[in-house]
Amino acid sequence: MFSWALVFLIFALVAGVLGFTGLAGTASSIAWILFVVGLIVSLIFLVAGRRPTV
């Protein structure tokens, strides 16, 4: 998930440098959403992995 966020971030930076501002804005929004989703999923797995032993 984080690798896709990084890909879209790099894509947004390149598009912004080349002047495609609408495309850069869309790609940066996608990168931000993927980063947040990846962070939430990571936290869920971190909490779910700490089950007490019986």
Swiss-Prot record:
Q: How does it sit in the membrane?
A: Multi-pass membrane protein
Q: Which residues cross the membrane?
A: 4-24, 29-49
Where in or outside the cell? Answer: Cell membrane
List GO terms (cellular component aspect).
plasma membrane
The record's keywords, sorted A to Z, are: Cell membrane, Membrane, Transmembrane, Transmembrane helix
Q: Which NCBIfam families match?
A: PRK13682.1-4
Q: Which family does it belong to?
A: Belongs to the UPF0391 family.
The record's annotation in HAMAP family points to: UPF0391
Q: What is this protein called?
A: UPF0391 membrane protein TERTU_3637
